[in-house]
Curated annotation (Swiss-Prot):
It comes from the Eukaryota. A zinc finger (C2H2-type) spans 83-105, 111-133, 163-185, 191-213, 246-268, 274-296, 302-324, 330-352, 423-445, 451-473, 516-538, 544-566. There is a cross-link at K58, K150, K240, K300, K449, K583 (Glycyl lysine isopeptide (Lys-Gly) (interchain with G-Cter in SUMO2)). Residues 224-235, 379-404 have a biased composition (Low complexity). It is found in: Nucleus. Residues 480-496 have a biased composition (Pro residues). The gene is Znf48. It comes from Mus musculus (Mouse). This is Zinc finger protein 48.
Length: 591
């Protein structure tokens, strides 16, 4: 038997005859909804009307007593919220909710975690926190339905990732990620730049690269073009300074992307939580630490497909591949000459800069005069009065060099150097881009070899040459080398008497059988004069000055070789008289 619509709201006699029913009938005996008249004892689909009015998605359970349309349910009225907060005036239906709410004002946290002691204002928050210690799952996972799993990508555990790389064993959530990753092993770059032809393994990397051609504006889709003729290759367009709007305020380096700037600024701002366990060096990113560890392990995972050579960095392999393909993406805007490396292009562009005239022709040449002897053994240079001829009155601290009115004034820096090779050698005229290269080159003329081998005493003009020489002594050392601290930080101040270990030299060196030991590196010498000359390599003392240019030397023979360069450049008949014969001055008190 089917129930009529009216039977849906039938109630017991107690409910029908109750006082609340009579009160509602007195309040609203009849309701008019459209063309239909509804009464409380005969409401049809009343809950549907109520749900549609409230905008709810599902039907709510019916009240035992039919309500008038528009009357709020019990607990939904403003008069039912008797618990009011005295701080902010917010009302609550239950007193327990008010107590929890007031803890947000007082800061009270009575629920403590038994593991770490952290406090919480609500017991449910403490329960959620304790799951971080126990590893308990908050929700039970239903058994999966038959068929392939349909879990969100971000919630797939690492152990359930179906795609694994056969080269390195790395796992991925999707097969497309595996395909992108395998290109790092194969070197495949299917995404080509339509402007310069550079390839990329990922389309997003190509998009970022294309911004370097037109700043932040992405180029329009490029139709596949024909290959340019090999006779006249077009020079690719390189990014300019105005195409890199993001500038680092610490070092001035420019970037095309803001994310690249933020990544770069980590090296300045810190912190650097990734530390190397081998050498203690710290890095801001974990990827930088991984690259650095290959220096210690010797791992070279990036192999060249042409010759099989390995590289520790992918960028180094990219540069190496250009030697096989002949690709030169870095072009000079002046002469259209292209280079495979950007650093080579920067050095080449210096050749287009006009050098400025900078020489010592504006300064007078001082006649050759002997330099005063250095302080005797056992005295400090700071206590010995300087000779007036060696006062630092002239520019650059050189003796006797007074600028002419047209030259640079006192206290002003010298004119800036410009050009490809601004640092010229006064001996042979050879130019160098860096002053450090000029200093190394000068040792060819002077014969200076300040880098000595602690094993055999052999001298070298370059520190790298000494490092190579030290490898020949590996395995054939007769005595342990001195500790590094003695080589880097001398025990004695410059000019003081070296401390000779008493265990090696008993008493004062009075006979030929005694050895004179260097207090800096422990090297032994049969004569005290050799020890004095050797000490100058540590203290930097250069008592022999050139009268032409004011350059100092630690050995008189080195100064003689240097002065021959000045005489060779000066023809006979020029000057006050014939050139004087060069004699070696032996400082008094040293030998």
């Amino acid at each position: 038997m089917e129930a009529s619509p009216g039977d849906e709201f039938e109630h017991s006699p107690q409910e029908r005859d109750g006082p609340e029913i009579k009160e509602e009938e007195q309040l609203a005996p009849t309701l008019q909804v459209g063309n239909t008249s509804l009464k409380p004892d005969g409401i049809q689909c009343w809950d549907d009307l109520w749900d549609r009015r409230e905008g709810l998605g599902k039907r709510q359970p019916r009240d035992p007593v039919p309500r008038i349309l528009g009357e709020p349910r019990w607990g939904q009225g403003s008069n039912d919220r008797a618990a009011v907060c005295g701080e902010c005036g917010k009302s609550f239906r239950q007193m327990s909710d008010l107590v929890k709410h007031q803890r947000t004002h007082t800061g009270e946290k009575p629920y403590k975690c038994g593991v770490c002691g952290k406090g919480f204002g609500d017991s449910s928050a403490r329960i959620k926190h304790q799951r971080t210690h126990t590893g308990e799952k908050a929700y039970r996972v239903r058994p999966p339905a038959p068929g392939p799993p349909k879990m969100p990508r971000s919630r797939i555990p690492a152990g359930e990732r179906p795609t694994i790389c056969g080269e390195c064993g790395k796992s991925f959530r999707q097969s497309s990620d595996l395909v992108k990753h395998q290109r790092t092993h194969t070197g495949e770059k299917p995404y080509k730049c339509g402007i310069c032809g550079k390839g990329f393994g990922d389309s997003s990397a190509r998009i970022k690269h294309q911004r370097t051609h037109r700043g932040d504006q992405l180029p329009r889709p490029v139709v596949p073009r024909r290959q340019p003729s090999p006779a006249a290759p077009a020079a690719p367009h390189r990014p300019k300074a105005q195409d890199k709007p993001y500038i680092c305020t610490d070092c001035g380096k420019r970037f095309v992307l803001s994310c690249s700037l933020l990544s770069h600024q980590r090296s300045h701002l810190g912190p650097k939580p990734f530390g190397c366990d081998v050498c203690g060096k710290e890095f801001a990113r974990g990827s930088d630490l991984v690259k650095h560890l290959r220096v210690h392990t010797g791992e070279k995972p990036y192999l060249c497909p042409e010759c099989g050579k390995g590289f520790a960095d992918s960028s180094a392999r990219v540069k190496h591949l250009r030697t096989h393909s002949g690709q030169r993406p870095h072009a000079c805007p002046e002469c259209n000459r292209s280079f495979s490396l950007s650093s080579t292009l920067l050095r080449h562009r210096l050749t287009h800069v006009e050098p400025q005239d900078f020489s010592l022709a504006a300064y007078p040449v001082v006649p050759l005069i002997p330099s005063p002897p250095p302080p005797p053994l056992g005295t400090s240079p700071s206590l010995t009065p300087r000779s007036p001829s060696h006062s630092s009155d002239g520019p650059f601290g050189l003796p006797g060099l007074e600028p002419e009115p047209g030259g640079p004034q006192a206290g002003e820096p010298p004119p800036p150097l410009a050009g490809d090779k601004p640092h010229k050698c006064p001996e042979c005229g050879k130019g160098f881009r860096r002053s450090s290269d000029l200093v190394k080159h000068h040792r060819v003329h002077t014969g200076e070899k300040p880098y000595l081998c602690p094993e055999c005493g052999k001298g070298f003009a370059d520190s790298s040459a000494r490092v190579k020489h030290l490898r020949t002594h590996q395995g054939e050392r007769t005595r342990p080398p001195p500790p590094p601290s003695t080589l880097l930080r001398p025990h004695n101040p410059p000019g003081s008497v070296p401390i000779v270990p008493q265990s090696r030299v008993q008493g004062r060196p009075s006979g030929p059988s005694q050895l004179h030991v260097c207090g800096f590196c422990g090297k032994e010498f049969p004569r005290s004069s050799d020890l004095v000359k050797h000490r100058r390599t540590h203290t930097g003392e250069k008592p022999y000055k050139c009268a032409e240019c004011g350059k100092g030397f630690g050995d008189s023979s080195a100064r003689i070789k240097h002065q021959r360069g000045h005489l060779a450049l000066k023809p006979f008949g020029v000057g006050d008289g014939p050139p004087r014969p060069l004699k070696e001055e032996s400082p008094a008190g040293l030998e």
